[in-house]
Amino acid sequence: MGKASKKSVAVAVAPAAVPAKGKGGKKREAEDEIEKAVSAKKQKAAAAPPAKAVPAPKADAKKAKKQPPPKKAASSSSGSSSEEDSSESEEEVKVQVKKTTKPVKQESSSDESSDESSDDEDAKPADPVANNGLKKGKPASSDSESDSDDEMDEDEKPAAPVKKTSVTAQKKKDDSDSSESESDESDSDEDVPTKSKAPAVAAKNDDSTDGSESESDSEDEDAAPKGAAKKESSSDEEDDSSEESSDDEPKQPQQKKAQEESSEESSEEDSDEEDEKLAKTPKKKTPAATKSQNDEPKTPASNQSQGTESATLFMGNLSFNLNQDQVKEFFQEVGEVISVRLATHEDGSSRGFGHVQFASSEEAKKALELHGCDLDGRPVRLDLAHERGAYTPHSRNDTGSFQKQNRGSSQSIFVKGFDSSLEESKIRESLEGHFADCGEITRVSVPMDRETGASKGIAYIDFKDQASFSKALELSGSDLGGYNLYVDEAKPKGDSRDGGGRRGGRSGDRFGGRSGDRFGGRSGGRFGGRDGGRRGGRGGRDGGRRGGRGGFQSRQSAGTASTGKKTTFGDE
């Protein structure tokens, strides 16, 4: 009885003395009241058909599997309890339910064990559970999935402290149950909550409902596990939600990290591209600087050539009887003629060309207007004389010059006509003395014949400057020791473009050799000269005219010139 008074004080219920009638009350009156309560519960059940939820039996089955010992204890205790005890407990529960419906919202302590509160809770979560099953398609998959909507309903009521104060609520329930049942039943109920928090509520509600032995008690059994399932589902879903939130939280930093890495990579690529551009720009600027240096104003080649244009004209297609006085008379109307040089052969005959020098280049250009005019019965050909280095050998300038394009290729002169019977040293001395007045001589070459050791009758003289070279050319036809010298510009070796021989004149060889050779050599050849010969002599005054045996007999002699051993092959 003392326990019942404690219960009434804790729940703040005034008529707590109702169960004091105890076991000495009338049995008939208790049975009548039970029947009235059963009929009232049936009416409530009929008025609220949505309270039948499909997942409720499954939850009961799960809890029956999880906690078989509490149910066994409940069944044993219910068997030992009397009908009077169950009736008295039912009356006491009814009184408490009517006056403690409001505290149920604060904490699920005593109303979870009552019948009406279980019915109310059964009616409320029925629809959310059904909706949850339709939405997710998994009505019986797990506690967190089937009871997720139940947790939302309990969240409207302050359900957070339920988890913390479950132990105290269970103790209060134990006290109330002990006053309603025997001492053994209360002991078995007190052992169950120590093992688990939420399932203990379901076990205690089962103990109270089994003792009633009525159909209303079965409905209470369905409602009580639902309340426990709500608590379990709330705790499970809180854990799941916390895990999901914890799982979602690292995803966001990972995405941020990926974005930061991508941004860093893009920034690095941009910086690399900028570095490459910076590295390339100096390379582009460097050639520009060199170009600016190379693009410095320079005097064009044409201007240079014009600045050093010669005042000398080349005359071609001249009459062989033309003299210097006739040339001066021809050009006296154009300007002042300083000198006239007519090229001659070794015998003094004219070669048909010459040079005329004027006082200025303007006068020389003006004299070009007389090109094609008749001079001593022939149309004269006029052209500006090329200064040394002002043209490319073997090429013609824009004026269509017809003079020898190899002229001016060097500052060397070719000399022949001197006494070739003298020794090499004496020939050298005589030539140096004869051309000393022209200018400084840098080299004198007198080729010698290897077989005879005598001079070939030719010599080459190099001068230091162009002026000396030009003066030396004027000495062509001059006398040296009783011999008339022939002076001309030296040609490179192998140049035999001019017919009539390099120095052979009218008696030259067939292919332009200097002394009658086949391809312009100095010492004759197989088909040299007009009178030919195998060697063509040493280049006398008239070229290869004094050649050897001549004719085409040289072919036969050339065939027998070999000195090797003769080999014959017999028919054997």
UniProtKB/Swiss-Prot annotation:
Q: Where is the composition biased (Polar residues)?
A: 300-311, 553-566
> InterPro entries given for it?
NUCL_RRM2 (IPR034350), Nucleotide-bd_a/b_plait_sf (IPR012677), RBD_domain_sf (IPR035979), RRM_dom (IPR000504)
Gene3D superfamilies to which the protein is assigned, alphabetical = 3.30.70.330
The record's subcellular locations are: Nucleus, Nucleolus
- Which is one Gene Ontology cellular component term of this protein? nucleolus
Function in brief:
Involved in pre-rRNA processing and ribosome assembly.
Q: Read off the CDD domains from this record.
A: RRM2_NUCLs
Q: Which GO terms describe its molecular function?
A: ribosomal small subunit binding; RNA strand annealing activity; RNA strand-exchange activity
Region spans: Disordered: 1-312, 488-572
Stretches of Basic and acidic residues bias are at: 27-38, 488-520, 528-545
Query: Which biological process terms from the Gene Ontology are attached to this UniProt entry?
Result: eukaryotic translation initiation factor 4F complex assembly; formation of translation preinitiation complex; rRNA processing
- Protein name per UniProt: Nucleolin 1
Q: Taking every annotated instance into account, which residue ranges of this chain make up the domain RRM? A: 311-387, 411-492
Q: Which organism is it from?
A: Oryza sativa subsp. japonica
Return the Acidic residues bias intervals: 82-91, 109-122, 144-156, 177-191, 208-222, 235-247, 261-276
Q: Which SUPFAM superfamilies match?
A: RNA-binding domain, RBD (SSF54928)
Composition bias type Low complexity, residue spans: 7-21, 45-58, 72-81
Answer yes or no on keyword RNA-binding.
yes
Which controlled-vocabulary keywords does the entry list? Answer: Nucleus, Repeat, RNA-binding, rRNA processing
